[in-house]
């Protein structure tokens, strides 16, 4: 059964196509030939008695500071090794208006690059309700705004050829995160494939006293 996102207000459900790699997945994972075009569909449901506007945003996949793949829009800059940005090959409506208590299928148009390649183009389609204004004050009087969105991952490939993993260390620097001193290590995956279950072993030694060491 295909998974989908749902709140009391609205529902987002991908319509899985015939060229889906695994039809049990709750996101798009399609195989399409070079230069080919396809229209994917997502069903939106308005569960309220009020007209509703849903914003759509396309984004390329990225890896966050915790090593997790994210498919929603982010301020993380695209790596220079990114050859195909999903946003350049997928189009969708920017805003969809839903009448009260209705369902509507929307089209997501996909065009595969003309060049042949092995591996995957990865990204996502994010849906968010316009006019969210759920503001609350915490115990310290700080106002917190809660907004909700759903992201459907979209993976596109031309074939099932395996891609050998690769990993490059491009930069090391010091900095701060949440007031803590940290060592920033930039790892680059230049291939069009996921690197899963990766472990990092690091040793930090003092410059003037090599006996001072931290192991991670």
What do the PLM-derived regions correspond to, one by one?
Residues 4-216:
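Long beta-sheet-rich domains in secretory-pathway and surface-associated proteins
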């Amino acid at each position: 059964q295909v998974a989908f996102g749902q709140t009391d207000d609205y529902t987002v459900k991908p319509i899985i196509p015939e060229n889906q790699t695994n039809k049990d997945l709750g996101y798009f994972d399609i195989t399409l030939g070079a230069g080919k075009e396809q229209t994917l569909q997502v069903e939106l449901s308005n569960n309220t008695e009020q007209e509703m506007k849903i914003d759509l945003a396309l984004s390329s996949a990225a890896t966050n500071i915790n090593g997790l793949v994210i498919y929603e829009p982010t301020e993380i800059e695209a790596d220079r090794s990114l050859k195909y940005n999903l946003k350049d090959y997928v189009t969708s409506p920017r805003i969809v208006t839903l009448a009260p208590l209705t369902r509507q299928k929307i089209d997501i148009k996909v065009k595969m690059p003309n060049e042949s390649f092995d591996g995957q183009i990865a990204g996502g389609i994010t849906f968010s309700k316009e006019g969210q204004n759920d503001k609350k004050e915490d115990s310290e009087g700080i106002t917190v705004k809660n907004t909700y969105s759903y992201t459907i991952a979209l993976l596109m490939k031309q074939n099932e050829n395996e891609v050998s993993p690769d990993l490059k260390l491009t930069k090391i620097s010091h900095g701060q995160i949440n007031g803590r001193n940290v060592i920033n290590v930039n790892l680059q995956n230049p291939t069009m494939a996921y690197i899963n279950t990766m472990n990092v072993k690091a040793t930090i030694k003092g410059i003037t006293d090599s006996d001072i060491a931290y192991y991670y």
